[in-house]
Regions:
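Conserved acyl-donor/pantetheine-binding loop and adjacent beta-alpha core of acyl/acetyltransferases
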Residues: 75-108
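A short helix-loop-beta-strand connector motif used in the catalytic cores of GNAT acetyltransferases and
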Residues: 54-66, 75-78, 82-87, 213-216
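C-terminal "cap" of GNAT-fold acetyltransferases
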Residues: 170-198
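Conserved catalytic-core motifs of GNAT/GCN5-like acyltransferases
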Residues: 84, 145, 158-178, 214-218
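Short amphipathic alpha-helix that is part of the acyltransferase structural core
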Residues: 2-52, 59, 64-69, 73, ...
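Conserved GNAT acetyl-CoA-binding A-motif
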Residues: 132-148
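Conserved acetyl-CoA-binding loop-helix of GNAT-fold acetyltransferases
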Residues: 105-113, 117-133, 159
């Protein structure tokens, strides 16, 4: 087992370590996901994955990392290699079909309710992105979707340097932001034309995005 990161929780100084997850961790993954869902007041904020979906990722179609206190899984984060279909997020950000195989998705991220407030989301995001960039340049783009007004997830994506490229209906009609981060030639954008717009002005945001603007902070 290769330890990718070691740290201590800010709240109680408990040491934790981060490793890659495999199929042998699937029971712990499902158990932690159930705990996280049960603790949510608004259960629609999280789209849980099924056992089959986790297995698909762990069988070589993505990457999962987990944080452990001794042998207890307290947080995990996943990346998914998506199927090439009409719903592919690469199409939403304007990529040609020939480049869709260069896209990987940020998938689910869960932290045990007792371990929140320790910056685990950010730590796991940094670790998994570092691991991804070691993957022999197989991927050029990371994409994901976030529901409007899911403030923690929006903050999480912006903190990673991801940008909103589209706002459109996905997954059977639900409005979603489509985020993207380019993995190569990663330099800060020097924004020359900046517009501020209210979060509840969806049509105004869509108009700006269609003109080539990107959402970069809130």
């Amino acid at each position: 087992m290769t330890v990718l990161y070691k740290g201590t929780l800010k709240q109680n100084n408990n040491p934790f370590h981060v490793t890659l997850l495999s199929l042998e961790h699937i029971e712990q993954i499902l158990s932690l996901q159930n705990i996280v869902v049960e603790a949510l007041e608004d259960k629609s904020r999280l789209q849980p994955l099924s056992q089959e979906e986790f297995q698909y990722i762990l069988e070589g179609n993505g990457m999962m990392i987990g944080a452990f206190i001794e042998n207890e899984l307290i947080a995990f984060r996943a990346l998914l290699v998506p199927p090439i279909d009409d719903e592919h997020l690469g199409l939403d950000i304007g990529l040609p079909e020939s480049e869709l195989h260069r896209v990987i998705y940020q998938e689910i991220s869960n932290v045990h309710p007792n371990c929140r407030g320790n910056g685990m989301q950010k730590i796991l995001a940094n670790v998994i992105m570092d691991e991804l960039q070691k993957e022999d340049s197989k991927y050029d783009y990371v994409c994901c979707t976030v529901a409007p007004f899911n403030i923690p997830s929006l903050k999480d994506k912006f903190a990673q340097g991801m940008e909103i490229a589209a706002l459109k209906e996905k997954y059977g009609g639900s409005l979603r932001y489509v985020f993207v981060k380019k993995l190569r030639g990663d330099k800060e954008n020097d924004w020359t034309d900046v517009q501020s717009i209210l979060m509840n002005d969806a049509s105004g945001q869509q108009a700006l995005l269609s003109e080539g603007y990107r959402g970069y902070e809130m």
